Swiss-Prot record:
Subunit structure as annotated in this protein's UniProt entry: Tetramer of two alpha and two beta subunits.
Superkingdom of this protein's organism: Bacteria
Protein name listed in UniProt: Glycine--tRNA ligase beta subunit
Alphabetical UniProt keywords: Aminoacyl-tRNA synthetase, ATP-binding, Cytoplasm, Ligase, Nucleotide-binding, Protein biosynthesis
Top EC group: ligase
GO biological process, one term: glycyl-tRNA aminoacylation
MF terms (GO), sorted A to Z: arginine-tRNA ligase activity; ATP binding; glycine-tRNA ligase activity
């Protein structure tokens, strides 16, 4: 017979960001505890609000199953002396297990024979086990910050006020500090601040809802989503999607509703990004936009109650918002009193990173990189790229960015436009921070792309150059994100450039700052790029295709991506498998190859003449297509070699006794191998 467990930890308001992680930890810990206790179950569900963490487990047995437990001891060799008498190791093991030496068994394992003790353990009542498990569970929930309260020697995110613990409807008795577990829960702090008894999980959910608490976070989230969309439509606009804000607000309320208020028109001169950021960061308000994405003069707030008089709530929120936006308007007006370029000098007093110097030094480095990129890829944009790089960090010392760091770049664009800078430069200032997240928007212009690449590469090479290399999950300088961003930009724009050459230039500019050998840094940065590129391409293509194409070179990322795409497409064709077999036959014969020209005069068989002739024709056509990155067409041409290769192997003995003939045949096969290898190493393909 299986039963259910209900655990509710009731506390003062837990910070919204703590709740999801606490619920995940709660589930992880109980799974481990149940496994250790040999208790199976059907399902685990966790739910949470600002005031409660809830755990529900279905399908627990009433009694722990019996078990045969074996404790392993020392090896037989160490347990007995030459006369077969037990040693101190055997006696100590027996004593530790509470048995006589004569009760010890010898068990054969992969590592040899060892002593062991096997005993039968009778299962204990689950209710009894849970009384031991649950206090560990409550005390073990990790929080980013926890606190003590009163004079208690316990810690939690916020003071705990009640605990519900029921197994099969019966209280599981334990204590957490002065709090005793029971069957009494509590309702909404403001709308139903009273206690109520609980019988089981279904009854608990019903009673919570009757007391204005929606325990299920997914239901609260969906309620907020629907209500915000509904209210936004009443303005003639629609909700600006914001999943992270939705997630946060879900854990700020127990019984959500949605109320709309107005933004005073005087503040609409402030860039919409600032208004949205201010409302989002300080007030947790949702924004409303029209069909073109223009901000409308409304906000949506999610109170934790059903307001008796919504107008009172609106007035209160509008009063607070006016104060917030007045600050933003002040910063906006004050910042525009100084030209953006006049702020650049102030970057000399802003430390970017202790070992890498100031933000001004960083700007000078990546400006030089941006100029090189422009000169190589779009010379007409060189001057604008240099100007963008010079100005793009200047807004970091503005009042607005000091108050709202999220609008860096955006304010640079606004201030540049106000100062009369070229529109292309102003837009590129905002674009150079892109992408801000995986799969996010990329720079639309070459200018923005050049500066973005240069800035990110300086960050990557600089950090690697002074030993700030990501380890495990730790990546304080977001180098993985920066590298993925660079790769995404290069592939999106189709830029053909030498990655190693760009890294060399960056390290040259960083020479005075490096604390590690330049060659080591260069190698590590390239490998870091390789790892990120493999991961990105591996999301879309088979691993062996990616590996095969990269083996032919990945210094030009855009070119490598084209070869991966072509190879994957070609792989779907009927002639792919026979071609791969032919190529592998070539590889198996030549090993390291012969670096010598082919001499037709040494041919002894018509098959050699035929293969050489077909190879010359194929090289001519395929090389031209490879040069134009028409790799699928080039592979089609190369596939035409198969019949001639097969005929060659059928007709001649490659490893002839005559060394000149032998080496000439190897040189012929080496030429074929080099043609294949300009696209991929077919030997790395599976199958």
């Amino acid at each position: 017979m299986s039963k259910e467990l209900l655990l509710e930890i009731g506390a003062e308001e837990i910070p919204a960001g703590f709740v999801p992680k606490a619920l995940a930890s709660l589930e992880e810990m109980i799974r481990k505890e149940l496994e250790t206790a040999r208790l199976c179950f059907d399902a685990i569900v966790t739910m949470g609000t600002p005031r409660r963490l809830t755990l529900h487990i279905k399908g627990l047995p009433v009694i722990q199953p019996d078990a045969e437990l074996t404790a392993m001891g020392p090896s037989k060799k160490a347990a007995f002396d030459a006369d077969g008498k037990p040693t101190k190791a055997a006696e100590g093991f027996a004593r530790g297990q509470g048995v006589d030496v004569s009760a010890l068994q010898v068990i054969s394992t992969d590592k040899g024979e060892y002593l062991a003790v096997t005993r039968q353990e009778t299962g204990r009542p689950t209710h009894e086990l849970l009384a031991e498990i649950l206090p560990r569970l409550v005390a073990g929930i990790p929080f980013k910050k926890s606190m003590r309260w009163a004079d208690l020697d316990i810690r939690f995110a916020r003071p705990v006020h009640w605990i519900v613990a029921l197994f099969d409807g019966i209280v599981v008795p334990f204590s957490f500090g002065p709090i005793q577990s029971g069957n009494i829960s509590r309702g909404h702090r403001f709308m139903a601040n009273s206690t109520f008894p609980v019988r089981d999980f279904a009854h608990y959910l019903d009673e919570c809802e009757r007391h204005f608490v929606i325990v299920d976070q997914e239901r609260r989230k969906e309620t907020i989503r629907k209500e915000t969309h509904r209210v936004a439509k009443t303005t003639g606009g629609h909700l600006l999607p914001d999943e992270s804000l939705l997630e946060e607000v879900t854990y700020l309320v127990e019984y959500p509703s949605a109320i709309i208020g107005s933004i005073p028109a005087e503040f609409l001169v402030v860039p919409k990004e600032v208004l949205i950021t201010s409302m989002r960061s300080h007030q947790r308000y949702f924004s409303v936009v029209d069909e073109n994405g223009k901000l409308l003069p409304y906000f949506i707030t999610i109170p934790n109650t059903l307001a008796e008089d919504p107008a009172v709530v609106v007035r209160g929120n509008e009063r607070v918002l006016r104060a917030r936006l007045s600050d933003a308007r002040f910063f906006f007006d004050e910042d525009r009193k100084l030209r953006l370029e006049s702020r650049v000098e102030s970057l000399k007093s802003v430390v970017y990173q202790q070992k890498l110097g100031t933000s001004y030094e960083k700007m000078e480095r990546f400006r030089a990189l941006a100029e090189q990129l422009a000169e190589q890829l779009n010379p007409a944009a060189k001057q604008q790229a240099a100007r963008t790089a010079f100005l793009c960090k200047a807004d970091l010392v503005s009042g607005m960015v000091g108050e709202f760091p999220e609008v860096q770049g955006i304010m640079g664009r606004e201030y540049a436009l106000h100062d009369g800078e070229e529109t292309a430069v102003a837009n590129a200032i905002a674009e150079h921070y892109l992408p801000t997240q995986a799969g996010g928007d990329l720079p639309a212009s070459d200018i923005g792309a050049f500066v973005s690449l240069a800035d990110k590469l300086d960050t990557l090479c600089g950090c690697f150059g002074v030993g700030l290399i990501p380890t495990g999950a730790a990546d304080p300088y977001a180098l993985r994100r920066a590298t993925i961003g660079m790769i995404s930009i290069i592939l999106d724009k189709g830029y053909s450039l030498s990655l190693s050459g760009l890294i060399d230039k960056s390290l040259e500019l960083l020479a005075a700052k490096l604390t590690r050998p330049r060659d080591e840094v260069r190698h590590d940065v390239l490998e870091f790029f390789r790892g990120r590129f493999v991961n990105l391409q591996g999301n879309a293509y088979p691993a062996d295709v990616v590996e095969a194409a990269m083996a032919a070179g990945f210094d030009d990322l855009a070119d490598c991506a084209e070869r991966i795409r072509a190879l994957d497409t070609f792989r779907q064709r009927d002639d792919f498998q026979p071609l791969t077999v032919a190529f592998k036959r070539v590889c198996n014969i030549i090993k390291e190859g012969i670096d010598a020209p082919v001499a037709p005069a040494l041919f002894q068989d018509e098959a050699e003449h035929t293969l050489y002739r077909v190879l010359q024709e194929t090289k001519l056509s395929a090389s031209d297509k490879i040069q134009q990155q028409q790799y699928l067409e080039a592979l089609t041409d190369i596939a035409g070699l198969k019949w001639a290769v097969d005929a060659f192997f059928d007709a001649v003995m490659v490893m002839a006794e005559d060394s000149a003939v032998r080496n000439n045949r190897l040189a012929l096969l080496t030429t074929i191998n080099r043609l294949f290898s300009r696209i991929a190493d077919f030997g790395r393909l599976a199958g």
